[in-house]
């Protein structure tokens, strides 16, 4: 059986696309050793400069170590964004493809053909291979974005919002439930806009109601809410849901009114605060956000306001990014902030974020929680790694459970645990039942 090596870079939306490719390549044995592979695939990220550099390095490394006669394919966002330049600059790559043909990768490999379709998503896919877990899956509900954020180039290569049909999404979840999956994270560039392009006024609410009807879905969460398309009605539907947990992931990017205007984020500070307070008031809520520092126009005064806000409003998780100057964005032509200042601000805000995350972890000590066993931990085979049921898979932390204390524990199982300590950035716990 021929072997395939697939390197998936970037976000969890890219991971879904990679899993679709693995589904199309079921006749191949998957290997994590590139030198053994007959086919090598890099699914690239082209969002910001650091991600682009990582993608290029990965491609060049595989060009160096691939075995003679193997096929190297490069797919994904970077290819979609810089198609002409990369085809010219990477003569050792055999197949090029963008973001619309993942389900056709087997045909492209068989014919050694490159392909770039106008479509940037798949409506329906029945052969996807879920990686890394036997209980959790990401479900992509739309592709593209209608927002006009000043710093973001995604609409330039992903296109405008294109929502999947609700029944197609339901069918995918039902299929995965039949295969044993029970925990689902619903993702998109802007999940709260779902359905607006196909005439659904409250598309995400409608989707939530349909997912709740599926027998076997135990846990679900929504990622990537956008402030201007999120309202209290949607939040209340999540809060009242018997299936969707009170997990609120809404990147705010900044909190200063003038910066929000410069960044073309739509809502101002007051509207964002109202949404965040509603989220925080929900029982057992978990709040995640994203912040950009160093965007053109960010004065010391605006930055200080952001720092004070993050110290006062306690998020559970904060992802912090340095502004990246990107072509095809409004901020590309703006007066840029020097890199040394951006780096200084990034370091300061990262420390604030780390303290907030640390406090969120420590607040769990002594509590009883529902958790899922993910497998042996990153610390080695003496511990099982687990995540709280409310957390997203991999990104929100790992809980260590001593393997020697356990009998008949099932990987992928849902258990009641007691958090006992927080050591070295990780929670320790024991299974109660």
Curated annotation (Swiss-Prot):
Reaction catalyzed: L-aspartate(89)-[ribosomal protein uS12]-hydrogen + (sulfur carrier)-SH + AH2 + 2 S-adenosyl-L-methionine = 3-methylsulfanyl-L-aspartate(89)-[ribosomal protein uS12]-hydrogen + (sulfur carrier)-H + 5'-deoxyadenosine + L-methionine + A + S-adenosyl-L-homocysteine + 2 H(+)
Uppermost EC category: transferase
One cellular component term from this protein's GO annotations in UniProt: cytosol
One MF term in the entry's GO annotations: aspartic acid methylthiotransferase activity
Residue intervals of the Radical SAM core domain: 131-362
Compartment(s) where it occurs, according to its Swiss-Prot or TrEMBL record: Cytoplasm
EC number: 2.8.4.4
Chain positions recorded as [4Fe-4S] cluster 2 binding sites: 145, 149, 152
PANTHER family in UniProt: RIBOSOMAL PROTEIN S12 METHYLTHIOTRANSFERASE RIMO (PTHR43837), RIBOSOMAL PROTEIN US12 METHYLTHIOTRANSFERASE RIMO (PTHR43837:SF1)
Protein's name according to its UniProt entry: Ribosomal protein uS12 methylthiotransferase RimO
Native source species: Campylobacter hominis (strain ATCC BAA-381 / DSM 21671 / CCUG 45161 / LMG 19568 / NCTC 13146 / CH001A)
């Amino acid at each position: 059986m021929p072997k395939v090596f697939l390197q998936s870079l970037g976000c969890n939306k890219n991971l879904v696309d990679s899993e679709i490719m693995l589904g199309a390549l079921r006749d191949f044995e998957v290997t994590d050793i590139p030198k053994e592979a007959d086919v090598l695939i890099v699914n690239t990220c082209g969002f910001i400069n650091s991600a682009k550099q990582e993608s290029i390095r990965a491609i060049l490394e595989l060009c160096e170590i691939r075995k003679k006669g193997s096929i190297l394919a490069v797919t994904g966002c970077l290819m979609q964004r810089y198609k002409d330049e990369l085809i010219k600059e990477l003569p050792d790559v055999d197949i090029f493809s963008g973001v619309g043909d993942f389900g056709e990768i087997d045909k492209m490999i068989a014919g050694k053909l490159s392909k770039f379709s106008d479509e940037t998503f798949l409506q329906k896919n029945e052969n996807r291979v879920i990686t890394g877990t036997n209980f959790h899956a990401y479900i992509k509900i739309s592709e593209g974005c209608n927002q006009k954020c000043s710093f973001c180039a995604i609409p330039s290569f992903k296109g405008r919002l294109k929502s999947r049909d609700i029944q197609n999404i339901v069918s995918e979840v039902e299929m995965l439930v039949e295969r044993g999956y029970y925990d689902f994270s619903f993702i998109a560039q802007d999940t709260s806009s779902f359905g607006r392009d196909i005439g659904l006024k409250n598309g995400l609410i409608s989707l939530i109601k349909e997912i709740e009807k599926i027998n076997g879905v135990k846990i679900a969460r929504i990622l990537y809410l956008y402030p201007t398309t999120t309202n209290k009605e949607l939040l209340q539907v999540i809060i009242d849901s018997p299936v969707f947990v009170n997990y609120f992931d809404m990147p705010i990017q900044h909190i200063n009114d003038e910066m929000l205007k410069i960044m073309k984020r739509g809502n101002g500070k007051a509207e964002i605060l109202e949404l965040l307070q509603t989220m925080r008031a929900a029982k057992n809520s978990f709040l995640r956000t994203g912040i950009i520092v160093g965007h053109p126009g960010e004065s010391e005064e605006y930055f200080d306001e952001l720092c004070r806000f993050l110290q006062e409003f306690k998020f559970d998780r904060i992802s912090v990014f340095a502004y990246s100057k990107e072509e095809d964005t409004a901020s590309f032509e703006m007066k840029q902030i020097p890199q040394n200042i951006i780096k200084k601000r990034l370091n300061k805000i990262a420390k604030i974020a780390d303290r907030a995350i640390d406090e969120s972890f420590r607040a769990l000590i002594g509590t009883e929680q529902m958790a899922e066993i993910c497998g042996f931990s990153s610390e080695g085979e003496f511990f099982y790694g687990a995540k709280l049921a409310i957390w997203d898979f991999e990104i929100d932390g790992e809980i260590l459970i001593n393997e020697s204390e356990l009998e008949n524990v099932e990987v992928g199982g849902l258990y009641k645990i007691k958090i006992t300590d927080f050591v070295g950035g990780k929670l320790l716990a024991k299974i109660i039942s």
